[in-house]
Amino acid sequence: MQKKAVLFDLDGVLVTTDDCHYRAWKQMADEEHIPFTRTDNERLRGVSRMASLEIVLEKAARAYSEEEKLELAERKNRYYVQLIRKLTDAAILPGARETVIRLREAGVLTAVASSSKNARLILTQVGLLDLFDTIVDGTQITKSKPDPEVFLKAAELLHKNPQ
């Protein structure tokens, strides 16, 4: 019998990094004198970094060049990485670790399929990295969700045909 596989998204499924994202965007926005609230942050869920930046810049008092936008996105990510380096297993969502462990004990292959370019760092910080047979992150794909590329790549690495 062929082994089954389960693919997990990262943020909002296994862990929560919402506050880290909010604080990083808020710091960057404050430095640029752009109003940014938790309500604004909700609009950024599931949106790529550059698309998120465009949403943040909707409230900016001035226009930004493409070069400036790239710098702002990089700055936000530097702040975000500083914050996720401080994550602990408290960021793991209830039942996530236990679910993955039970699946592995049952012989099911497991993978993380995340658009985040920081997925491995997050998994390492919270102590989940070793629970997965493969990890596909934003460094390995060209299209962000909702495009299925990240999930198809994870299935391919597990030698599975998606169903």
Give the positions of each predicted feature:
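Residues at secondary-structure transition points
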Residues: 16, 43-47, 64-67, 71, ...
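A metal-dependent, Asp-based hydrolase signature
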Residues: 46-83, 94, 102
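Short acidic capping loops at alpha-helix termini that bridge into adjacent secondary structure
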Residues: 37-40, 65-68, 130-134, 162-163
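Active-site neighborhood of HAD-like aspartate-dependent phosphohydrolases
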Residues: 1-42
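Short alpha-helical
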Residues: 20, 48-51, 98, 117-121
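Short, acidic loop-to-helix structural element flanking the phosphoryl-transfer center
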Residues: 2, 82-112
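Substrate-recognition "cap/lid" segment bordering the active-site pocket of phosphatases
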Residues: 89-90, 113, 117-163
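Short helix-capping segments at alpha-helix termini
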Residues: 31-34, 60-63, 127-131, 159-160
